[in-house]
Amino acid sequence: MPRCDIITPNTVEAAYLADMPEVTTVEQIKEAAEKIVAAGAKSVVIKGGERLSDNSAIDIFYDCKEFTEMAVPKIYPSYNHGAGCTFSAAITAGLANGLSMKEAVLQAKKFVTAALKHGFAINNIVGCTNHTAYRKYSE
């Protein structure tokens, strides 16, 4: 991880990377984030998503200095196929456009939230995020 400016694991991946049995609370996310950064990553966003709360989708950004909690209301139905990849790509786009890491992460959270809010069904089993939603709906 020393070559990583940022990594974006979900809670299951974060538990593995931090050598923890599980990550199911905000406190455990913070502990995992500190361990992941200690392993060499410069910053981390652990995507708790809908796993941590009954009402909110929670992600936590850590940059070796402070924790930033990003919580938005859960979205139903959540057509979330590709949401993690979309989030990482949106961070990369923000960085390429000159944003700081924290600014890029915060913008990416807004982008993915809009993409999920306006996601669509592909068939009766799965749906995907709407990558045009952030710009189209000015969210």
Kindly give the residue locations of the regions a language model identified:
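Short pre-catalytic strand/loop immediately N-terminal to key active-site residues, enriched for Gly-Thr
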Residues: 67-81
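Glycine-rich beta-alpha junction loops
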Residues: 13, 49-52, 73-76, 109-112
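Charged C-terminal helix
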Residues: 102-139
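Short, charged, surface-exposed loops that flank catalytic or proteolytic processing sites
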Residues: 22-29, 96-106
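Conserved phosphate/ATP/ADP-binding segment of small-molecule kinases
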Residues: 1-66
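Histidine-centered active-site/metal-ligand motif
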Residues: 50, 81, 131
